[in-house]
């Protein structure tokens, strides 16, 4: 931690908090539930060092530069593709893996044709040896993140530990990370615990496992976005479905698109479309003149609500299996024209930041 602090400067500035070397962890949160769980992860996976992601642009910039130096990311021609970098995945790791994705609950009756079920204790006994010392020689990144707007009573908080800078940078693109997420959580124990380790990218020991009753997600031996960006399908659909069942709301792999004409009239279209057809693009587009709004909507007591956990940035397309482009741009960029739909299951995304 201290070594990393020297690399990024002796002092950090984070939303009005001045952080000295060596005290970053306690400065980010005093939530004992979070601190105890992260300590448990450190003892299990034994990383050489642990870095807490505070969400500051300076820290993220330093991580990008580190990834360039190690080859985890490659900076592309900045004249032709300004703000773009390239990330490679293994050739055997370019899609979600249905046969290795499990829902583990205590009730065997939860087993059905739509999921792979296993008893939680049996699954943990299988996976714990894979996680043992898996981060030795590596850095553990702790990513507090919020799904939904900060301050919204509908938003949900998660914390993901990972050994991948690619995961850190993409979670910043797709969610609200750092101090603001921890402030949303406060002292609560109501957060999703996500543990990811690339390990050896061994397809025979690749697992993406949800434990709804524990509010936990375990992912190992993958570097592909859908398997390792745990706020996506793992949390926003699988864990959230259980949360919604318990709390009286729904999580759906759908969209409700509001289209507003120049006169201000809004019509809504519902769409239950499969993966890789472009559901996200309309919701993430910010044309020069606003023509549409997208998000999850509902009606309660005569009032309409919506919440889209994705924000700020949207995916378009690049063309090489096993590769991803990550576009770095202004957090305040708004006028972005949509391109072709992203193929989410093929292992490559092009991300552009927008407000």
What are these regions (language model features)?
Residues 8, 13, 265, 278-279:
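Short loop/turn segments at connectors of secondary-structure elements within structured domains
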Residues 19-277, 287-299, 306-355:
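Conserved internal helical-beta-strand scaffold that buttresses enzyme catalytic cores
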């Amino acid at each position: 931690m201290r070594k990393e602090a020297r690399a990024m400067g002796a002092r950090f500035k984070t939303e009005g908090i001045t952080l000295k070397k060596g005290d970053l962890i306690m400065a980010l949160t005093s939530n004992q539930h979070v601190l105890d769980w992260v300590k448990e992860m450190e003892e299990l996976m034994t990383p050489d060092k642990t870095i807490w992601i505070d969400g500051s642009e300076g820290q993220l910039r330093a991580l990008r530069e580190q990834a360039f130096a190690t080859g985890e990311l490659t900076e592309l021609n900045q004249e032709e593709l300004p703000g773009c970098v390239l990330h490679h995945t293994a050739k055997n790791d370019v899609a979600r893996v249905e046969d290795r994705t499990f829902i583990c609950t205590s009730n065997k009756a939860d087993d059905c044709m739509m999921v792979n079920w296993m008893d939680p204790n049996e699954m943990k006994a299988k996976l714990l040896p894979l996680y043992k010392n898996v981060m030795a020689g590596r850095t553990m990144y702790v990513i507090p993140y919020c799904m939904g707007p900060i301050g919204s009573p509908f938003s949900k908080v998660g914390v993901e530990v990972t050994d991948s800078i690619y995961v850190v940078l993409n979670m910043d693109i797709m969610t609200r990370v750092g101090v603001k997420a921890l402030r949303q959580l406060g002292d609560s124990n109501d957060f999703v615990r996500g543990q990811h380790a690339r390990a050896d990218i061994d397809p025979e020991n690749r697992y993406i496992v949800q434990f709804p009753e524990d509010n936990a997600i375990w992912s190992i031996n993958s570097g592909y976005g859908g398997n390792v960006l745990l706020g996506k399908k793992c949390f926003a659909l699988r864990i959230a479905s259980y949360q919604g069942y318990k709390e009286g709301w729904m999580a759906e792999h759908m969209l409700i698109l509001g289209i507003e004409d120049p006169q201000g009239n809004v019509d809504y279209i519902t769409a239950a479309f499969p993966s890789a057809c472009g559901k996200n693009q309309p919701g993430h587009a910010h044309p020069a003149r606003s023509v549409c709004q997208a998000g999850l909507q509902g009606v309660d007591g005569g009032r309409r609500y919506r919440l889209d956990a994705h924000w700020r940035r949207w995916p378009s397309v690049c063309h090489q299996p096993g590769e991803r482009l990550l576009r770095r741009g202004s957090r305040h960029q708004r006028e972005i024209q949509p391109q072709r739909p992203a193929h989410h299951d093929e292992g490559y995304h092009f991300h552009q930041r927008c407000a």
